[in-house]
Amino acid sequence: MAKGVKHISSNNGKWVYYDVVTGKMAHGEAHLNYDKEHTGWYYFDQNTGKMAHDFVYLRQHDKWVYYDKITGKMQYGEHYINDGWYYMKPVTGALAKGRTWLDAGKKWVYYDKTSSRMIHGGAILDGHHYFFDPHTGAQYNKQQIIDRLTSQARALLNQHPDCPGVLAANGGLICPFGPCMAFVWYIFHSAGLDIFLCDGAKTGWPHHNYDWYRSRGRVSHTPHVGDIAFWKFGDAWAHDYDASYAGVVVEVNGRNVIIIDAAYGDIGIRSAYNGANYAHPYYDE
């Protein structure tokens, strides 16, 4: 009589388990503990008895778990599976969902509420704006997000990227009267922070972006580093608009506000022009 974990080669092959006392084939969940190699939780198909080697939903416990592709044993902790990171809770093996603290890495991360895969980059989740490190998944705080944005802006000084061209290639609207807003968009985009500019809207028209923030009560005369500075100059084309120019605030020293913008045929750093209104992205909300 066969007992223990056995491989059956017929019908494309499968691993099964026969009870070490009765010899009866196991179905459903089973905790094995008959030798050092086979100790832990396993799952066997309810009909065929085939050992699971993948994600399985355990209806009776209302949880998703993962069984190793080689051993079939239920897994716990962090695992890299099918090009993504997952976390299985230490006691139950249930896949983590939502915002989760990883003590081993001393970091907050976020697992998608549907797939349970770790999220990287910018994301709007439950109405809140987040940025997760592209490599580690660690959640950035407000200052880290602003530092990432302003560092990217400084890295573009005296460069000549085709900001309108990249914006157009990404499906954005182009303003034919200048690249200032396309440059602001390009800073956010190249830093991976697209969602922090009008929730990911793609338009090179300054007034589109200004109106978006103003309608949400996010515009004031008080500047902060990481803000978007807007002006309405006397351009004839902008007569009916509330903004015709934009730049990014990178320093605030008392009343001296420093911006980086695309002006005079170059990307430069300079003191803010008079009469600015400052839009405040949702860095911490």
Residue map of PLM features:
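Glycine-rich, flexible loop segments associated with nucleotide phosphate handling
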Residues: 38-41, 174-177, 241-247
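...with weaker cross-activation on analogous glycine-rich loops/strands in unrelated enzymes
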Residues: 194-266
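Extracellular adhesion/carbohydrate-binding repeat motifs centered on closely spaced tryptophans
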Residues: 1-144
